A protein has these predicted regions:
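Hydrophobic protein-protein interaction segments
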Residues: 2-215
């Protein structure tokens, strides 16, 4: 399957080169929030799973904490109602980075303080629960050790990338081409089938990190 991966990588690099003009650098926190709103309002593929808008609350600059609490509630409702239609990946490399530093690469470091040992342990325990409930897979993809990206498929013709580098630079790419969306879906399925660890192995790794963090508290 290495040949398959190499072929996808070459194809994707070609598409990336052709879409350089669509990449925008995000340096301001407000720009990141605007992209976050765009992601939240992305319609699902092929069907509407809720009649009501699941995200009526915008993130406001004023009274941000209360606004985020309300927003978090709606996000949880959305995930609960759509858990059969959502899937996610996290890497061994990203998990190790989180345990060691208290940072997730998804959010640039200037935006928040590193999480405490207790917070990291709490998140790892929740991750164990999420793996049991949702389609979340631990994958070994060392080629992505210095960046993180979230992918939102808005519909059958649109693919939205948000790429965050280790330095905190955020780039966004939108592709409006059905064949590219389907090609990326094939690549995603390859990662799931060939590069993911079993749930049992994921639990063992997470539990070992929890034990490691607990020892640091003593």
């Amino acid at each position: 399957m290495a040949e398959t991966y190499d072929a996808y990588e070459i194809l994707f690099n070609q598409y990336l080169k052709e879409t350089k003009c669509l990449i925008t650098k995000k340096d301001d926190k407000s720009d990141v929030i605007e992209d976050f709103k765009c992601i939240l309002y992305a319609p699902p593929i092929g069907a509407v799973y809720q009649e009501d808008d699941p995200f009526p609350v915008f993130l406001e600059d004023n009274d941000f904490v209360e606004s985020f609490k309300k927003h978090s509630m709606y996000l949880k409702q959305f995930v609960k109602h759509n858990k059969d239609h959502l899937s996610g990946l996290y890497t061994l490399q990203g998990l190790r980075h989180f345990v060691d530093t208290g940072y997730t690469i998804d959010f640039p470091q200037p935006f928040y303080q590193p999480l405490t040992i207790n917070d990291r342990t709490k998140i790892l325990r929740r991750l164990n629960n999420f793996i049991n409930t949702y389609s979340i897979n631990l994958v070994d993809v060392p080629e992505y050790d210095n960046m993180s990206f979230s992918v939102i498929i808005m519909n059958m013709n649109t693919l939205y990338f948000q790429i965050v580098s280790a330095s905190g630079t955020i780039k966004t790419i939108q592709l409006h081409e059905a064949s590219l969306v389907m090609a990326f879906n094939d690549y995603y399925q390859y990662i799931l089938e060939e590069r993911s660890l079993s749930k049992e192995d994921a639990f063992k790794i997470i539990d070992s990190y929890i034990t490691q963090l607990d020892m640091l508290k003593e």
